[in-house]
Amino acid sequence: MTEFTPYFFDFSHLDYRNFVVLRFHGYSKRKICKMYKLAYFCILRVCEQAQKNDYRFTYKDYVYLKSYDVTNEFICKMYRIDLLDLEFFEVMNR
């Protein structure tokens, strides 16, 4: 696990962006549960919402993830986006 200390402002509510950043930096789902004082099924619900496309990926999300050095490949994996689509998305929003 890399040395990464999250400095998110709100530890009371886990959103998918924070989840992706923490997973990228090597935090397990169980460790995230302890950090946010959540039950494990809450993490699964957040992931399930993203899989059902209830969570829209926006340029604001992209900029946020890049500010935490999340790679494009990892973003594609977590959001189930094709790499070419992500590159097109980045170019169109510049």
Predicted regions and their residues:
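Broad hydrophobic/π-residue packing in well-ordered secondary structure
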Residues: R23, K29, C42-C47, K66, ...
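General helical structural elements
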Residues: Y27, C33-K34, Q49, V70
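DNA-contacting interfaces and partner/effector-binding or oligomerization modules
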Residues: T2-Y7
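Short, solvent-exposed alpha-helical "recognition" segments
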Residues: F41-D61, L84-R94
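Short, amphipathic alpha-helical "recognition" segments used to contact nucleic acids or chromatin
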Residues: F9-Y27, D54-V70, F88-E90
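Short alpha-helical "recognition helix" segments of helix-turn-helix
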Residues: I32-C33, I75-C76
